[in-house]
């Protein structure tokens, strides 16, 4: 029970940490700028839009904890991770330019799943340890959880940039050429490393202002210049490439959640160490 709880907790934290990281990039770097939110306001609105995730967790956590004390943790923890997996798949099916209500509802669903898992899993891990060893058990549980959260940033950032790199050069080249930028200049701008593009979008910076020389736009119409160097064109330009990385990341998170549910099933029925 102790091992199963820690393994499932590790996998859950690995999926959840990556989710928060990827969604913030999605909102702050792509969706909010495309909908006219000023770059300086995107961090605030990213936090507001992810509130349903926390609300679902907060509301279901205490209820699941109380119920698991009576009926055992296995059903609640495993069921919660399966619900979270469904939520991740639904996120992967959303278009990059999603509607608000489905997005918020899916985040709430994932929060509910995580809330159903967290408290019962913690209780199960602690109950499996003798009373005189519960301090060490708590430390081991926290180490698994914190290590997974830190590791998830590297894992999901790598997944996101891998998906981005697959289509970014072609998409950027075609997008710039469609506005009248010459092929050599467009190709040079499109060769920017995917990590740089991702961070530029995340920080609210349009790198086209430095990647494309002013001389290359001297013959363009004024509207085309304003579009290229404005705040909305760059997020729209890279959105299809970012979408590939997002979908891959969410499917990986769903797989991790299913594995966490499977690991949770091995914890056995309700058990409290009497030592």
Regions found by a protein language model. Give the residues of each.
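A general structural signal for well-ordered secondary-structure junctions
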Residues: 1-3, 33, 150, 165, ...
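Transmembrane core module of solute transporters
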Residues: 1-136, 152
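Transmembrane-helix exit segments and adjacent C-terminal regions of multi-pass membrane proteins
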Residues: 69-74, 81, 188-275
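Transmembrane helices with small-residue packing motifs
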Residues: 91-98, 164-172, 268-272
